């Protein structure tokens, strides 16, 4: 990973990527850790069906995805689920009904930068299908699909493919 070259402290072109986790300046004592970003993915279910969203932006535009996104500073994973489902699908959910399932590491490639993420997977079961209003800047289509009809080749991210391999 060599996206950064210049040290923000001394301005020399001396940053080196080390140990697959940090940039260190060879001229001064500056160190920048590239820690994992937390992200959530919510498996919205109704009976044996799963709600999938089709991505309307890169990375993986046109691939199927679970609703979710990055955790903002000072935000819990559960609140991230609430916020993302409201933003993307206009769904109001109760955090008491969220069920944590598992997590997987992932790499999110965006505008030439690789972001290491830790994707936290939750399940939210709904009693009745309701009208879903998708955020069209992020989502081009939504689809309810039976669990046994899911095709991993159509899933956007490796972490979600690994999740579905274990979950299904």
What are these regions (language model features)?
Residues 45-87:
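Conserved Nudix-box catalytic region and its N-terminal flanking loop in Nudix hydrolases
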Residues 1-4, 21:
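Short metal-coordination and nucleic-acid-contact micro-motifs, chiefly zinc-binding Cys/His arrays
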Residues 133-163:
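NUDIX/MutT-family hydrolases
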Residues 17-18, 92-103:
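A short coil-to-beta-strand element that immediately follows conserved catalytic motifs
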Residues 27-51:
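Conserved N-terminal beta-strand and adjoining loop/helix that marks the start
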């Amino acid at each position: 990973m060599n996206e950064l070259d210049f040290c923000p402290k001394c301005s020399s072109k001396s940053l080196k990527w080390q140990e697959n986790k940090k940039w260190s300046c060879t001229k001064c004592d500056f160190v920048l850790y590239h820690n994992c970003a937390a992200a959530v993915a919510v498996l919205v279910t109704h009976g044996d069906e799963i709600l999938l969203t089709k991505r309307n932006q890169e990375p993986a535009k046109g691939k199927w995805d679970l609703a979710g996104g990055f955790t903002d500073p000072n935000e819990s994973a559960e609140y991230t689920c609430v916020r993302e489902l409201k933003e993307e699908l206009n769904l109001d959910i109760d955090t008491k009904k969220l069920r944590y399932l598992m997590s997987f590491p992932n790499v999110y490639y965006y505008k030439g930068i690789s972001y290491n993420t830790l994707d936290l997977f939750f399940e939210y079961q709904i009693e009745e299908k309701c009208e879903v209003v998708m955020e069209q800047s992020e989502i081009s289509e939504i689809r309810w699909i039976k669990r046994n009809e899911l095709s991993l080749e159509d899933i956007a991210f490796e972490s979600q493919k690994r999740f579905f391999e274990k979950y299904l």
